Amino acid sequence: MRLCDRDIEAWLDEGRLSINPRPPVERINGATVDVRLGNKFRTFRGHTAAFIDLSGPKDEVSAALDRVMSDEIVLDESEAFYLHPGELALAVTLESVTLPADLVGWLDGRSSLARLGLMVHVTAHRIDPGWSGCIVLEFYNSGKLPLALRPGMLIGALSFEPLSGPAARPYNRREDAKYRNQQGAVASRIDKD
């Protein structure tokens, strides 16, 4: 059962759940909290690689990822990031989120943006128990027009679901946690699997 708005506010008040900066009550809806777009992005460079062998030797996968991923792009608040049709880009939420070991989060895109072709997460919308950091967004423009995305705009909504008990291996305590405390648009670390 997901937390309702009253429970989300109570968990925030009690410090069991942390969203920083804390959203105003107007952004806490029936069962979700609206989140905004941060100012950090990462794109794919133009490249000539025919493919990336995701299960190949780790050093080759790492080198291939370094060749195709851009450095992090940091925008001023007044600037826009343009996502063209058929492009994939990474970004982050403005808010940093910390979940306790007995709560899982879910990220959903906004229907109004989806109707323009913007996918906010390609597949990864679960936020693990014990997570702490900004949420990486996997943008894909499936529409026909470039989309101007600006830091601070409403980009998605988080919902929260209590677990039957605290996780034995929450994300923040796992040795293999590749994205612990991320604050930027961190590229894939599949080579660390």
Curated annotation (Swiss-Prot):
Pathway(s) this gene product operates in, as recorded in its UniProt entry: Pyrimidine metabolism; dUMP biosynthesis; dUMP from dCTP (dUTP route): step 1/2
Binding site for dCTP: R110, S111, S112, L113, A114, R115, D128, V136, L137, E138, Y171, K178, Q182
Region annotation (Disordered) ranges: 169-193
Keywords in alphabetical order: Hydrolase, Nucleotide metabolism, Nucleotide-binding
Swiss-Prot/TrEMBL catalytic activity: dCTP + H2O + H(+) = dUTP + NH4(+)
Residue numbers annotated as active site: E138 (proton donor/acceptor)
Enzyme nomenclature, EC number: 3.5.4.13
One term of GO molecular function: nucleotide binding
Keyword Hydrolase belongs to the record: yes
GO annotation (BP), single: dUTP biosynthetic process
Subunit structure: Homotrimer.
Assigned protein family: Belongs to the dCTP deaminase family.
Summary of the function given for this chain in its UniProt record: Catalyzes the deamination of dCTP to dUTP.
Protein name: dCTP deaminase
Gene that this sequence comes from: dcd
